[in-house]
């Protein structure tokens, strides 16, 4: 009987967050759809083979590939939150619950805190992913290694009097490699690693007793991944910067939405002087 009542309370608790779950699911679907099924519009793409900004060498083996980026960002950030809430509870600040929304009866403070933390993190990841994917398609900027990806047809170039060409001169048979060359801005690696490591750093500083030195690995890891994208000729410097800016904006909005500082409600009004 008690277990049935507990299950009902948890169901009612999760219903309070249906809207957030829907956003996470919808944004994840939109991101996957944009990555798998959509490509940037190539009709208006024009480029010069003499442009040094897109004439870097194509590097097949990236320092940090897509899978490694997902593990370092999504996997590592969730693991830090889960591990701290489950096994390092002594590091959690006593007043952490005051920053959360009101907890229904029958739901423990520990569970409420862990659920809210992971919920905020997943909102950040999914919204950031959807926005990044959409912006890549809309902007359609060329990567630094685009010419090498394109493999220009020398015969078509010699038959043309123009110094500016379109995608029709590309001999690249692997369309995935070619179309990925049109999705430079913003950097997905940058937005993913900054959004997750930014949250992880902020979460540890706000809700745990870990000092700055113990959390400095978060921004350092993000910086390493960002620099690797420039070294691999996958992005221009402004691509990784724009990805980081987008990530910070998403962190700010989701943090404000999820965590509500209720401490001010507990402050008594100032006494009225007569």
UniProtKB/Swiss-Prot annotation:
Pfam families: PAP2
Membrane topology classification: Multi-pass membrane protein
Lumenal side: 1-15, 88-117, 204-214, 256-274
SMART domains per UniProt: acidPPc (SM00014)
GO cellular component: Golgi membrane; membrane
Compartments, record wording: Golgi apparatus membrane
Annotated region (Phosphatase sequence motif I), positions in chain: 136-144
InterPro entries: P_Acid_Pase_2/haloperoxi_sf, P_Acid_Pase_2/haloperoxidase, PA_PP_rel
Molecular function via GO: diacylglycerol diphosphate phosphatase activity; lysophosphatidic acid phosphatase activity; phosphatidate phosphatase activity
Catalytic reaction annotation: a 1,2-diacyl-sn-glycerol 3-diphosphate + H2O = a 1,2-diacyl-sn-glycero-3-phosphate + phosphate + H(+); a 1,2-diacyl-sn-glycero-3-phosphate + H2O = a 1,2-diacyl-sn-glycerol + phosphate; a 1-acyl-sn-glycero-3-phosphate + H2O = a 1-acyl-sn-glycerol + phosphate
PANTHER family linked to this entry: LIPID PHOSPHATE PHOSPHATASE, LIPID PHOSPHATE PHOSPHATASE 1
Protein name: Lipid phosphate phosphatase 1
Organism: Saccharomyces cerevisiae (strain ATCC 204508 / S288c)
